């Protein structure tokens, strides 16, 4: 899918209402805050998730063409907590194995009165392609190639907002395989939209993200100056499955140079928070003492992922 064809304008209707969630580019600061506020309203004062009847009589189909534990399960739980009916399509035994076209499979499922599809696929822009050919059903992007992962970015923003007063004055470091990370790409977009003016991308040069010149984004190929006095550290794993073999770093060498250790974390502000979208590879991109430490909010991110996905689903069907 050509990058210039991956446009998010098709996720809004003529009145500006969100009818699909394909990516965060093109959504206003006010709309992102609306999603975060809706997610917050689904968490009680004790930090527990509420249940809702908002998706009663709605049928949601999960189509995950890439391996997933956290994302698929949190989407399923989010739908169930909103009283939706959920099916996880068994792709290994579906008609796709008989060379049926994906769109034909989805049209067949839609004929079974599916209201919403949650799609994860290795191809950049696949959810956008589906939206252009499948009408009167909501499409929710659960990650497409290295392009975007909008709900992960939203849950990251919710997690940050729960610990920091404002986005505008934050210094946020993103450490790891930025080139192949759809999470990084969506996090950068969300942070820029919410007003963050100091975003630091820390990675070996071969794993950096070739952004257009931007005053709020700085690149570092040395972790220590990149972490200095930052408020938030988002750690990413090495996505070996998306790399050519020649670019895959030696794990021990990578940890020695870019792993987040307690000593390196001490360079950040004392109240800095540590985040990771999972799965974590301890001893590669993050030390266990950091992942399990007092500054880590990794498990809180998982809970917030359910709240955010509940919120998005409810907004898409206009029942938030």
UniProtKB/Swiss-Prot annotation:
UniProt cross-references to PROSITE patterns, sorted A to Z: CARBAMOYLTRANSFERASE
Record-linked InterPro entries: Asp/Orn_carbamoyltranf_P-bd, Asp/Orn_carbamoylTrfase, Asp/Orn_carbamoylTrfase_sf, Asp_carbamoyltransf, Asp_carbamoyltransf_Asp/Orn-bd
Involved pathway(s): Pyrimidine metabolism; UMP biosynthesis via de novo pathway; (S)-dihydroorotate from bicarbonate: step 2/3
Keyword Transferase: yes
Keywords: Pyrimidine biosynthesis, Transferase
Enzyme class, spelled out: transferase
Amino acids binding L-aspartate: 98, 182, 237
Gene Ontology terms: biological process: 'de novo' pyrimidine nucleobase biosynthetic process; 'de novo' UMP biosynthetic process; amino acid metabolic process
E.C. numbers: 2.1.3.2
Amino acids binding carbamoyl phosphate: 70-71, 120, 149, 152, 278-279
Domain of life per record: Bacteria
Gene Ontology cellular-component terms listed: cytosol
GO MF, one example: amino acid binding
Catalytic activity field: carbamoyl phosphate + L-aspartate = N-carbamoyl-L-aspartate + phosphate + H(+)
PANTHER family (UniProt xref): ASPARTATE CARBAMOYLTRANSFERASE (PTHR45753:SF6), ORNITHINE CARBAMOYLTRANSFERASE, MITOCHONDRIAL (PTHR45753)
Function: Catalyzes the condensation of carbamoyl phosphate and aspartate to form carbamoyl aspartate and inorganic phosphate, the committed step in the de novo pyrimidine nucleotide biosynthesis pathway.
Subunit-level organization: Heterododecamer (2C3:3R2) of six catalytic PyrB chains organized as two trimers (C3), and six regulatory PyrI chains organized as three dimers (R2).
Annotated protein name in UniProt: Aspartate carbamoyltransferase catalytic subunit
